[in-house]
Amino acid sequence: MKRSRRTKIVATLGPASDTPEMIEKLFHAGADVFRINMSHLAREKLPERIEVIRTIEREAKRPIGILVDLQGPKLRLGTFVGDAAVLENGQTFVLDSDPTPGDTDRVFLPHPEILSALEPSHGILIDDGKLRLIVTEVSEGRAVTRVEVGGRISNRKGVSLPHTVLPVPAMTEKDRGDLEAGLAAGADWIAVSFVQRPEDVAEVKKVAAGRALVMAKIEKPQALTRLDEIIEISDGIMVARGDLGVEMPLEQVPGVQKRITRVARRLGKPVVVATQMLESMITSPVPTRAEVSDVATAVYEGADAVMLSAESAAGDFPVEAIGTMNRIAEQVERDALYWSILMAQRSEPEPTASDAIAAAAHQIVEALSLRSIMAWTHSGSTVLRLARARPNASVIALTPKRETARRLTMAWGVHPIVTKDASDVDDMAFRAAKFAVRERFAEIGDRVIIVAGVPFGIPGATNMVRIAFVTREHAERA
C-alpha cells in the first residue's frame, strides 16, 4: 500500500479505537504508526493490543509502527476535607508532608524529594495551570506559597513545576514494568515522558538495548537548556505541546516547536509534533480553520510525523480525524512553497560516509529529476540520512529486518519493504527496480537511484550509489 504523502501520521489508540475493526479503519484512513499510552492501558492488555496491530499488518502486507508511551513521573496533591477547597488570590497556602486531608490553608504533597528541591520564587502549577502558586519560604518537609491565581482545587490534582529540576529518576517502577512489557511484546518505539536531561534518555536506552528505538518527549522547559544533547542521544523526538504549554507561556510554544523541529532535522532524528492538533474533532466531524492551519504549519516545517491524541483515542470521530490530517498533509505537499521551504532549511552534510552518500544521492535526484531512491539497509541509519535531506523523491527502504522496516514508518518520506538481502550487485539492481515498479514508484523507462553497501549484509557499510533503468522485464516480474 503506497501513501501519497511523505509526512507520517501517528494515531493514539484508546476507548474509541481499541477494537480490531476500528484499528483497521484508522490504518486504511492513513495511520502509519499507532501510539499506545501506558497512562491509560493496563499492562496485561498490551500484548493483546499489539497483536491486533500485527494481524492487520500481516493482512495489509505493509509494516506498521508501534509506539509505546511511558507515563513518566506524575506529581499529584493529596486529598481535601470534603474533597475540595477554594483558594483566594493573595492568600498563603502550604504544601507539606502531613498525609492528613487538606483544607484552605494546606495540603499533602506526597513527594518529599520535590519539597526539598523547591526554592523561593519557584512557580507551582496545579490542575494543568488553572491555579498558580509562588514559593515564598521553604523548610524541611514544607513549602509556603502565595496564591497568584486561585480557584477550586480538588483531590489528587496534578502538579507541574516549570522552574524546578525534578530530582526524580527518568522511569518510575510502573514505567520499568511497562517498558519491559512493551519490549517483550515487540514495540518498535518507546516514548520517554518528562525528559529533563540526556541521562533520562540514556537510562531507557540502556534497558532497551536496541530492542526498540527511544523517543524523547520534550515537555519540560528544563529540557530546552540541553536540547541538542537530548536530541543527539535520542532516536527520535516528540514535541509534546500539551505539558509545554502548561509549564511555559503559551505564546512561546510555537517558537519552541520550530526550534525543536529544526534541531531534530539537522541531527537527522525523526520529529513528531503532537497534542491538540485537531482537538475540536473530539466532538465535531470537522476541524476549526485554526486547527487545519496548525497541522499544515507542522507539515510545512518539515516534521516527520503529526500525531493525534484524544481525537483518535477518545473522540467521536477518530476515522474522520485521521482522514482530515491525511488530506491536509497531502495538500501541503502539493504546494510548491512547501518544497522551497524545505530546500531553504537544508543543512550541510556531516563528514561521514553515510551523509556523503545521502548528499550525492540527493544531488543526482535533483539533476535527473528522479522519482524514487531505492535504499538497501539493515539498521535504517542511511535511510534516515536520506530522509534528513527531504528529497523531492520517495525513499524506498529495502531491508531483510522486519523490525527496521517497522521503525522506519516514523520517518519522513520513507516507504519500507521487507525483503531478503541482495546476493550480488546485479541482484541488488534488478530487485530494486522491480520493487519500484511493483510499489508504483516507477514505470517502464524511468531511472531509479540505488543506494547500498558492498559487501552486502554488513550494517553501516553504505558505500555505493547506482542508477538503474526500469525495463519491461522488471515490470513483468514485479
From Swiss-Prot:
Where is substrate bound in this sequence?
35, 242-243, 275
Annotated positions binding Mg(2+): 219, 243
Q: Which GO terms describe its molecular function?
A: ATP binding; kinase activity; magnesium ion binding; potassium ion binding; pyruvate kinase activity
Pfam entry (one): PK
Q: Which reaction does it catalyse?
A: pyruvate + ATP = phosphoenolpyruvate + ADP + H(+)
The EC class name is transferase
Q: Where does ATP bind?
A: 37-40, 76, 157
Q: Does the keyword ATP-binding apply?
A: yes
May I ask which residue range the UniProt record assigns to the signal sequence?
none
Record keywords: ATP-binding, Glycolysis, Kinase, Magnesium, Metal-binding, Nucleotide-binding, Potassium, Pyruvate, Transferase
In this UniProt entry, which residues are annotated as the site Transition state stabilizer?
217
Superkingdom of this protein's organism: Bacteria
- Identify the pathway: Carbohydrate degradation; glycolysis; pyruvate from D-glyceraldehyde 3-phosphate: step 5/5
This protein's assembly is summarised as: Homotetramer.
Q: Which family does it belong to?
A: Belongs to the pyruvate kinase family.
Protein name as catalogued: Pyruvate kinase
**Lineage, highest ranks first:** Bacteria, Pseudomonadati, Pseudomonadota, Alphaproteobacteria, Hyphomicrobiales
Q: Which gene encodes it?
A: pyk
